[in-house]
C-alpha cells in the first residue's frame, strides 16, 4: 500500500467515509486539513491544486505516486478493501445501490432540515416540512430492509454501511429526537452498532444521539452571516459634465459571491464564525512551530530537527508534556491500539497549528502501552482551554516536564526520534504516530 494524502477541512462528514474505510483496510492515509499543508478557501483555489482537482472541491485524495481522485465515495472505494466493496458481484452491486441511495435520497433532505438548525441556511417552513417527510420515507425504507439484517449488505460492514451512516450522522446528532426516531427502531439499532465499531469510533469519536430536536435560531443565523461593510458616502468634488456621464456608463460590476462554487457543507464551513483564540492573551513567541515542523518533516531528526528545536525553544511561551494512556489493560490488538492514537489525532485537527506530539505504541498484542511527548503553546494543558480541543485527553495521565531537565531532553530525543532505551516504559517500541 503506497498510501496518500486526503485534503479536507476539519469535521467534514464527507471525509469521514474514506477515513473510516482506511481504518478497516489499514490503508496509510494522511489528513491535510490545516495550514501550512492545506487551508480551505485558499489552497483549493490555487492553480496547482486545480490542476490536480479541477473542481477545487474537498475531500480530495492524492496518492504518493501522484494519482489523484476526487468525490468522497470514490476515494472510500479506493482506500477500502474487497470486503468493504463486496465479495460477490451481487454484493458489489448492492453496495453501489446503497451508496447511490444515500447521495440521492438522504443527503438532500438531511441538508435542508439540519443546516438551518446550525445557522448555516435560512429557515423555510415548507422546505423543512418537505425534508422531514423525505427523511421519514428513507428511514422507512431502511427500517424495512434492516428488519431481518444486521448490516445493509451481507453479514459484515461494507461501504454501504459506512456511507449511509455518515449521511445520517448529523440527523441523529441534531434533529432525530427519540419520538421521531421511535418508529424506526431497526435503523437506530443498526446506526448505533456502526458508530460504536472501533474503526468508526477512531474517526467519529463518541456519537451522542440528540435528546431534543434542534430548531432554527434566527439570531444565530444572523451572527453567522458574513458582515458586509457599507462604505461611507462622501460628497464628490465637482467634476466636468463629460466625466460624470462617463462614470454613469461605467457602473461597477459586482464581484461574484465567494460561496457560489461551494456545496452546502462547504458553505457551512465558510459561514462558521472563527473560534476565539485561547492564546490571544499570550505575548508573541520567538519559537515558530511551523518552522520546526518543516525541519522535522524534511530533515534528519537527530542532526537537524532536534538541535533546531532546542536552539529556538521558548520555555516561557511553550511547554512540554508527557502523556501515558490510563487503561493499558484494555489494549488488545496492536492495530486497534493504533486506531486510538490516529483517531484522537484526527479529531484534534483544530489543535495542529499550535501543537506537536509524538505518541508511541509499545509492546505486542495483549501486552502493550501508549505514551507520548506533546508540545503546547503556553504553560497550561491545551485541552482545557477550548471546547474544540476537549477530545480523548481524559484517557491519559498528563505530567508537565521541566524543559531544562535531563529527563525532558532524553524523553524528547527518544520520542521524537523513535529510538532509544525508553527506560520509563519497559516494553519494546512497536510503532509511532506524529501529530503535526
UniProtKB/Swiss-Prot annotation:
Residues 275-436 form the EF-1-gamma C-terminal domain. It comes from the Eukaryota. Residues 221-249, 265-278 have a biased composition (Basic and acidic residues). Keywords: Elongation factor, Phosphoprotein, Protein biosynthesis. Residues 2-87 form the GST N-terminal domain. Phosphorylated by CDK1. EF-1 is composed of four subunits: alpha, beta, delta, and gamma. This is Elongation factor 1-gamma-A. It comes from Xenopus laevis (African clawed frog). The gene is eef1g-a.
Amino acid at each position: 500500500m503506497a498510501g496518500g494524502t486526503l485534503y479536507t477541512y476539519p469535521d467534514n462528514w464527507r471525509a469521514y467515509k474514506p477515513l473510516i474505510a482506511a481504518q478497516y483496510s489499514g490503508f496509510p492515509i494522511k489528513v491535510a486539513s490545516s495550514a501550512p499543508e492545506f487551508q480551505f478557501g485558499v489552497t483549493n483555489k490555487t492553480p496547482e491544486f486545480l490542476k490536480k482537482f479541477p473542481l477545487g472541491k474537498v475531500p480530495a485524495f492524492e496518492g504518493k505516486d501522484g494519482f489523484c481522485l476526487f468525490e468522497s465515495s470514490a476515494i472510500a472505494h479506493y482506500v477500502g478493501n474487497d470486503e468493504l466493496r463486496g465479495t460477490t458481484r451481487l454484493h458489489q452491486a448492492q453496495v453501489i445501490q446503497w451508496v447511490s441511495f444515500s447521495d440521492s435520497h438522504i443527503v438532500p433532505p438531511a441538508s435542508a432540515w439540519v443546516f438551518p438548525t446550525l445557522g448555516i441556511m435560512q429557515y423555510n417552513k415548507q422546505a423543512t416540512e418537505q425534508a422531514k417527510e423525505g427523511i421519514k420515507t428513507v428511514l422507512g425504507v431502511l427500517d424495512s430492509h434492516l428488519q431481518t439484517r444486521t448490516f445493509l449488505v451481507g453479514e459484515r460492514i461494507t461501504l454501504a454501511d459506512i456511507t449511509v451512516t455518515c449521511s445520517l450522522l448529523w440527523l441523529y446528532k441534531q434533529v432525530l429526537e427519540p419520538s421521531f426516531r421511535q418508529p424506526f427502531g431497526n435503523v437506530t439499532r443498526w446506526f448505533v452498532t456502526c458508530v460504536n465499531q472501533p474503526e468508526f469510533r477512531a474517526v467519529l469519536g463518541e456519537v451522542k444521539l440528540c435528546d431534543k430536536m434542534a430548531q432554527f435560531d434566527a439570531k444565530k443565523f444572523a451572527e453567522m452571516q458574513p458582515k458586509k461593510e457599507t462604505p461611507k458616502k462622501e460628497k464628490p468634488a465637482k467634476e466636468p459634465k463629460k466625466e460624470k456621464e462617463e462614470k454613469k456608463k461605467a457602473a461597477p460590476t459586482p464581484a461574484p459571491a465567494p460561496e457560489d462554487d461551494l456545496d452546502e457543507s462547504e458553505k457551512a464551513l465558510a459561514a462558521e464564525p472563527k473560534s476565539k483564540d485561547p492564546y490571544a492573551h499570550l505575548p508573541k513567541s520567538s519559537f515558530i512551530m511551523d518552522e520546526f515542523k518543516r525541519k522535522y518533516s524534511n530533515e534528519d531528526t537527530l542532526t537537524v530537527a532536534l538541535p533546531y528545536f532546542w536552539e529556538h525553544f521558548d520555555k516561557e511561551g511553550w511547554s512540554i508534556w508527557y502523556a501515558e494512556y490510563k487503561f493499558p489493560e484494555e489494549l488488545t490488538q496492536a492495530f486497534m491500539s493504533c486506531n486510538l492514537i490516529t483517531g484522537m489525532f484526527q479529531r484534534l485537527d483544530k489543535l495542529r497549528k499550535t501543537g506537536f506530539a509524538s505518541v508511541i505504541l509499545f509492546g505486542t498484542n495483549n501486552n502493550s502501552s501508549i505514551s507520548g511527548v506533546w508540545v503546547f503553546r503556553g504553560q497550561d494543558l491545551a485541552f482545557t482551554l477550548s471546547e474544540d480541543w476537549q477530545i480523548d485527553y481524559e484517557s491519559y495521565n498528563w505530567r508537565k516536564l521541566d524543559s531544562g531537565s535531563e529527563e525532558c531532553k532524553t524523553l524528547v530525543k527518544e520520542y521524537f526520534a523513535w529510538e532509544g532505551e525508553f527506560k520509563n516504559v519497559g516494553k519494546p517500541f512497536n510503532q509511532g504516530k506524529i501529530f503535526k
